[in-house]
Amino acid sequence: MNSKVFAVLLLLALSTCVLSEKYCPTPRNTSCKKMNIRNNCCRDSDCTSNAFCCAEPCGNFCHKASDKPGGRRVDPNASCQTGYVYW
């Protein structure tokens, strides 16, 4: 009996974790036609209000978390500098 209760509680806890997962929103643009990019952030800690630092074609921007996957969070270990980056 105790193992059944434990299994139900474990399943409930795991489903809560999965349902609470947050993502970067899907970017509006799929490509960047500029000769530079603008990074407003390089990691989540650069953002305010618990926003995520999300990679987009024209740079990194802070966005409110989305329930739907589609965007990509910036790798905090990647080389990055805030501001305009020219190539």
Swiss-Prot record:
GO terms for biological process: defense response to bacterium. InterPro entries: Elafin-like_sf (IPR036645). Keywords: Antibiotic, Antimicrobial, Disulfide bond, Secreted, Signal, Toxin. Disulfide bonds join C24-C54, C32-C58, C41-C53, C42-C80, C47-C62. The keyword Signal applies. Contains 5 disulfide bonds. Belongs to the venom protein 11 family. 01 (wap-1) subfamily. Has antibacterial activity. This is U14-lycotoxin-Ls1a. The lineage of its organism: Eukaryota, Metazoa, Ecdysozoa, Arthropoda, Chelicerata.
